[in-house]
């Protein structure tokens, strides 16, 4: 059963999304979306994969960060440090669901970087990273530098007002700082033709995690736009979560 859910973060923003809870589900996947993305994600990947999970008896939670999608706030309210807090809150709410015994975390792009930061052996049982943006600090700097600056200090970027606070707060983090905190199983997927996030970042994650597997998907770009690319992405991830 899919139902709309919402909960308040500590900064007063209501986070909104969907909970898909199959009957007798004992495991749940918490999804973390990418930069300028949302709980459905590019090409419907999060929605599609959540439906596939449900058919296999696994629950899922897909939320928008504050300032994104249907959650409270505007994109100019979006801060990296608060997004990290949002992710911790999502994990907390997932653990509170009756009957759930295992919590898995899946992050795409920016969400992959955040997932790698928040995943720890106490709160997460398995970790899935799709094209994790380990270079997000550098990307944020470039986004901010290369777009028109507004009087309030923010930058206007292709329809999105990027807050200087996002850029400031992301510098508080190393995108690889959380690797040491997670020793359980990790599944990483990355397109070989990704022009947005260098595949070498996934190779580094794979090398630094103690219990990791990497699937490099031929011809796939950052969005996994072709059916065969999508099927491999979903297939590798589902097989990993079911075993």
Regions found by a protein language model. Give the residues of each.
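N-terminal cap/lid segment of alpha/beta-hydrolase-fold proteins
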Residues: 1-24
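Short, surface-exposed "cap/lid" segments of acyl-processing enzymes
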Residues: 23-55, 60-64
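Catalytic nucleophile-loop/oxyanion-hole region of alpha/beta-hydrolase
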Residues: 68-98
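Alpha/beta-hydrolase fold nucleophile elbow
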Residues: 98-109
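Hydrolase active-site cap/lid region
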Residues: 121-162
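Short beta-strand/loop motif that positions the catalytic acidic residue
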Residues: 182-183, 188-190, 194
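Conserved alpha/beta-hydrolase "acid-adjacent" motif
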Residues: 195-201, 225
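Catalytic histidine-centered segment of alpha/beta-hydrolase-like enzymes
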Residues: 220-234
